[in-house]
Amino acid sequence: MKAIVFAYHDIGCVGLEALALAGYEIQAVFTHSDAPGENHFYASVAKTAAGMDVPVFAPEDINHPLWVNRIRELAPDVIFSFYYRTILSDDILQLPSFGAFNLHGSLLPRYRGRAPVNWVLVNGETQTGVTLHKMVSRADAGDIVAQSVVAIDDEDTALTLHGKCRTAAATLLAQQLPLIRSREIALTPQDDSQASYFGRRTAADGLIDWQKSAHEINNLIRAVTEPYPGAFTFLGERKVIIWRARVVKNNRVNVNHPHGGDAGSIISTSPLVVSCGEDALEIVSGQSEAGLYMSGSRLAAEMGMVPQARLGNLASRVQRRRTRVLILGVNGFIGNHLTERLLRDDRYEIYGLDISSDAIARFLGDPRFHFVEGDISIHNEWIEYHIKKCDVILPLVAIATPIEYTRNPLRVFELDFEENLKIVRDCVRYNKRIVFPSTSEVYGMCDDKEFDEDTSRLIVGPINKQRWIYSVSKQLLDRVIWAYGAKNGLRFTLFRPFNWMGPRLDTLDAARIGSSRAITQLILNLVEGSPIKLVDGGAQKRCFTDIHDGIEALFRVIENRNGQCDGQIINIGNPHNEASIRELGEMLLTSFNAHPLRDRFPPFAGFIDVESSSYYGKGYQDVAHRTPSIRNAKRLLEWEPTVKMEQTVAETLDYFLRTVDVPHTADATDTQG
């Protein structure tokens, strides 16, 4: 059986060796180049493959069409992935005749995602394991071939637990690979209701919160001790790395040093014991940032620790300057939800401008949120000053409702292109990073099954179809921004939302004048008891994305770890939530009829079909489907949407129904005056 292998880490080497022993013909191995600065404590897949005389490659983007075509030419029977760090596209997963299989370091469906060995220790689990499963478009979600349980002991660290998982993986593969080769496997679907997902960990995640229990802190230390960067805290401004520790119960702590409520206080220095939110922690070994590995008591002496001194978070003493984010259009749908997400992270400070503040009123008292009421076409000097002052610029102001494209095409062009071009040029002038909202509309009438940021054609209609003014305005700005990046070094990311929806999307008043998104218009029809108008029968399909999924992806774009989003175009949508507008209406009706406030509103008036020209006006043209490829989002952001459409529809409907002022109807218990 011909196999293509994607592998990294020790488990990758174990997988290669197991395949060779099972008699597979390994056609090629794809791995990663070792990242500079990363502690490489594990064996090399490249060296293992070279020892087998197997071709080995380390492409920067394995999902690029060039690599997909090269793999297609090899015509593999099967694909295996062993700890490969990049999510493989559907184009690759569909190539092998017998499917693709992944070995994951947990007992799926629990601990999907990255760093499962570290996360199970952080969370205090008593067992984990390895799972061999079929690969599908959603990471770690395919049917299970087999699993092997690994017990977690109290003294296990990430390194020792990884060794246990490596042994379990070798045994599991020795059992299952011959069955796959003979095509005799049995598959068990995963129970998604039991699934949990965890993202990648960074060195910063090792910061100790002394308010937690000693048991929880010790779990963190075990999870990130050598060869990982280690758990750490601060004595004043000096970093202290803790490599080993043990829990000290309350009844074993010196009664002269009560620690309840004094989390982070040093109780004694020999041994070095620190109070926690519950119990205390003895530091067995550690080091200062520039020092040597040593015992806890010697570390205390070297750093001048004394009883009752406090260990804690450097950020509470020496505040690193927060990233300043300028959001133009901060009161809009994306703007206000993004503000909420950024304010949950202490690293960000937000400056916002908009013509109103109803949606962001809840943030106005936050000291990290600065708002000015104004218009981007008027407040040019304020905008230029704040572009100079801020680090990341998000110009979210645009006319983005279809009826306006035909009703006010010149106004759409003036605002969406001309005013935003000024902002782009200021970002170039002051060397600021811009995160620009492109749109799924730029793909126009593209006939690809999935719209790909890097390969899909951007096709629009004839000039007399003014409906395309929005699409071409955005597309032209995309091209200008790209050119500024290539010629002037502008740091940018273009993100393309695909039909985001959720609470605070529009207002029902906007729907009353026809200037809203589809779901808001449909909700207005239900609230008022008017017929739901389905343009051209509502057959057009869209992929609807929950606002919380979308905002989490956008937050990661702003975060931009290791600069990986610079110069990139990223679709942000949910290809699994595809539905026609008619299906959206039917889903809304079902949720509406089940809502506890249903009896306050008129009876449903039915669906009626209308022609697009009569609804949107002359010059309108629609598209049959709009489905995103999200391979860039998966690769660059380690992001995948999770919220089902039914949940989003229900939450959006609930939000609007609770904003409607319905006259009170007296019942039998009311007093008649």
Curated annotation (Swiss-Prot):
Site (Raises pKa of active site His): D140
Annotated SUPFAM superfamilies: FMT C-terminal domain-like (SSF50486), Formyltransferase (SSF53328), NAD(P)-binding Rossmann-fold domains (SSF51735)
Any one GO molecular function term: UDP-4-amino-4-deoxy-L-arabinose formyltransferase activity
EC number of this enzyme: 2.1.2.13, 1.1.1.305
InterPro entries: Arna-like_SDR_e, Bifun_polymyxin_resist_ArnA, Epimerase_deHydtase, Formyl_trans_C, Formyl_transf_N, Formyl_transf_N_sf, Formyl_transferase-like_C_sf, Lipid_A_modif_metabolic_enz
Assigned keywords, A-Z: Antibiotic resistance, Lipid A biosynthesis, Lipid biosynthesis, Lipid metabolism, Lipopolysaccharide biosynthesis, Multifunctional enzyme, NAD, Oxidoreductase, Transferase
Reactions accelerated catalytically: UDP-alpha-D-glucuronate + NAD(+) = UDP-beta-L-threo-pentopyranos-4-ulose + CO2 + NADH; UDP-4-amino-4-deoxy-beta-L-arabinose + (6R)-10-formyltetrahydrofolate = UDP-4-deoxy-4-formamido-beta-L-arabinose + (6S)-5,6,7,8-tetrahydrofolate + H(+)
Pfam families: Epimerase, Formyl_trans_C, Formyl_trans_N
Binding-site residues for (6R)-10-formyltetrahydrofolate, renumbered to this chain: R114, V136, S137, R138, A139, D140
Catalytic residue positions: H104, E441, R626
Name recorded for this polypeptide: Bifunctional polymyxin resistance protein ArnA
UniProt source species: Pectobacterium atrosepticum (strain SCRI 1043 / ATCC BAA-672) (Erwinia carotovora subsp. atroseptica)
Region annotation Dehydrogenase ArnADH: where it falls in the sequence: 321-673
Region (Formyltransferase ArnAFT): 1-311
Binding site for UDP-alpha-D-glucuronate: 400, 405, 439-440, 467, 499, 533-542, 620
